[in-house]
Amino acid sequence: MDFGIGFLSNNVMLPILDFFYGIVPSYGLAIVALTLVVRFAVYPLSAGSIRNMRRMKVVQPIMQKRMQEIQQKYKDNPAEQQKAMAEVYREFGNPLAGCFPLLLQLPILFALFATLRGSPFADVNYQINLQIVPPDQPVLAQPFATKPQNIYVDEGVHFPIQAVVPSGTRIPVGQMVDLQFQTKEGKPFSELVAAYPNSHLQPKWQIIRGQERATIDREGHLQALQPGEVTVQGTIPGIAADKGFLFISALGHVGVIDQGELFITLPDGARQFNWGAIHWDILVMILGFGVSLYVNQLLSGQGSSNNPQQQTVNQLTPIIFSGMFLFFPLPAGVLLYMLIANIFQTVQTFILQREPLPENLQKLVEEQERAEAIKNRAPLPFEGKGAKGAKATKAKGNPSS
């Protein structure tokens, strides 16, 4: 039994999705509601990570200085060095403490991601590797079935469906076999669809590797032609793949540009760029994701660094992450989830950044601000050239004065 991502998706995410769709029959609203439910559920975990990151940003300069002093002082005594470092972590906290809440919420977020990449929002693919063998080679018929995937056959109705090769994956040249979809109990997928008049799902089959070794029609009738390896892909459409939501034309559409329609041929033979091939709804969501990522960086302080190289990397991170979706496209429904989740986290970061720090850390912040103010203040006319530096040194040495 699967107790991993698939278990969370099938037994947690899909029931929540069906619940909200039952209230308001819109898969777009169901995505929004499911995303918010999950983000509120992991709010305490993500809040712990954000708070720890904020604390570490405050104490990092002091911790680094303390660590360097300890390493220098106990360089010949590893046991004392480790003991002294443990005292520093006990006083200021462990930088790795914020990773644990993040790790706890990852399976939940991955399950949500996997749910939105499958049925009903996107087409579901099944791949089968076949071995075409010579006609005189003996073959033992052993039925083969892929791992089942949840398929929506109607609104709110889904079943685990697997692709099946009744005669097995070793097929003699000249033989014809029927590849089919069915439930784990053996009920044909076509019978399931026939039981729901509103469902018009039409699965299709195609060969994606070894086209010269076999042929197959859309219904799954495969004819073996010559020995070798063949990879067959069966696809079941998502019932909500062509459904729109707000400014999104189709929740299941993948990619910003329709590659085959990027240029059109005019009556005079000239080729012209086809602006209609660009899906502006997906482009807007990708740009929104990048902007929210950048704002989140600014709020959390991750975008600021004294190291110019690190500063450049931080500034480029939102661009790199957003650009990835141009080359590794995702369905529009998944992008909608990512945009909403990122906006939610940005608002969460904004709220948590305004929480008061613990008293000991607040004193450190005030001391750093006071020292920085003295350092950046222009000297008064009656002060000598060294007066400013002397006062800054005094402020660092005696912050309470």
UniProtKB/Swiss-Prot annotation:
Chief location: membrane
Q: Where is this region: Disordered?
A: 375-401
Recite the UniProt keywords alphabetically: Cell inner membrane, Cell membrane, Chaperone, Membrane, Protein transport, Transmembrane, Transmembrane helix, Transport
Q: Does the keyword Lyase apply?
A: no
Q: Which domain of life is it from?
A: Bacteria
Its BP terms in the Gene Ontology are: protein insertion into membrane; protein transport
Q: How does it sit in the membrane?
A: Multi-pass membrane protein
Q: Record's Gene Ontology CC terms?
A: plasma membrane
Q: Where are the transmembrane segments?
A: 12-32, 96-116, 275-295, 319-339
Q: Which GO terms describe its molecular function?
A: membrane insertase activity
* Low complexity: compositionally biased ranges: 389-401
- What Pfam families does the record point to? 60KD_IMP (PF02096)
Provide the family line. Belongs to the OXA1/ALB3/YidC family. Type 1 subfamily.
Q: Which NCBIfam families match?
A: PRK02654.1, yidC_oxa1_cterm
> Tell me, what does this protein do in biology?
Required for the insertion and/or proper folding and/or complex formation of integral membrane proteins into the membrane. Involved in integration of membrane proteins that insert both dependently and independently of the Sec translocase complex, as well as at least some lipoproteins. Aids folding of multispanning membrane proteins. Probably also aids protein insertion, folding and/or assembly of membrane complexes destined for the thylakoid.
Tell me the subunit arrangement. Answer: Interacts with the Sec translocase complex via SecD. Specifically interacts with transmembrane segments of nascent integral membrane proteins during membrane integration.
Q: What is this protein called?
A: Membrane protein insertase YidC
Source organism of this protein record: Thermosynechococcus vestitus (strain NIES-2133 / IAM M-273 / BP-1)
